[in-house]
Amino acid sequence: MLMRKKKLLSRISFGSLFLLCGTILSACTWIQANLRNLLKETTGKDFDLSKAIKIPEGRQNLINSLKKSYEVNPKDTTKLLLDAWKQSSEEGKLGIADLDFDQVTNPTEKDPFKNGAKGRAFRHWISKY
C-alpha cells in the first residue's frame, strides 16, 4: 500500500500542482501578499504575481520558486497553498468541469467515487495540466 502511494505521488507532477495553486493564488490579494512575502523570504526574488502568471516564463519561474520555497519552508508553503485552494473552492473558481460537486455532496445516483474512481478522476484532471 505504501509503495502504491509513493508511485502515485511520483506520477503527479508537482509543477502542475504548483501551477494550479499559483493561478488560484493570483486571484486573491491577501493570499497573493502572503505568497509574495514567502517567496521573497525563501528565494530572495520579488515577484509581481499578476504579471508573472500571464506569461509562460513567469509561470515557470513561479513554479520553480514555489518548489524552492517548499524545500526551505514546507509548512508555510503548504499552508499557503491549502488556504488558496480552500478559498478558490469556496468561491467556485477551481475550474474542474469534469467533476459534478453537487452530485458528490448530494448523490442522487450511485456514489461516483467508489472503487478507485476518485483517484482516476484526480489523475485525469491533473494530467490536463
Curated annotation (Swiss-Prot):
Its main location: membrane. It holds the Pfam family Lipoprotein_3. InterPro entries: Lipoprotein_3. A lipid is attached at residue 28 (S-diacylglycerol cysteine). The keyword Flavoprotein does not apply. A lipid is attached at residue 28 (N-palmitoyl cysteine). One of its GO terms (cellular component) is plasma membrane. Disulfide bonds: none annotated. Keywords: Cell membrane, Lipoprotein, Membrane, Palmitate, Signal. It is found in: Cell membrane. The keyword Ligase does not apply. It is a lipid-anchor. Residues 1-27 form the signal peptide. Belongs to the MG439/MG440 family. This is Uncharacterized lipoprotein MPN_654. It comes from Mycoplasma pneumoniae (strain ATCC 29342 / M129 / Subtype 1) (Mycoplasmoides pneumoniae). The lineage of its organism: Bacteria, Bacillati, Mycoplasmatota, Mycoplasmoidales, Mycoplasmoidaceae.
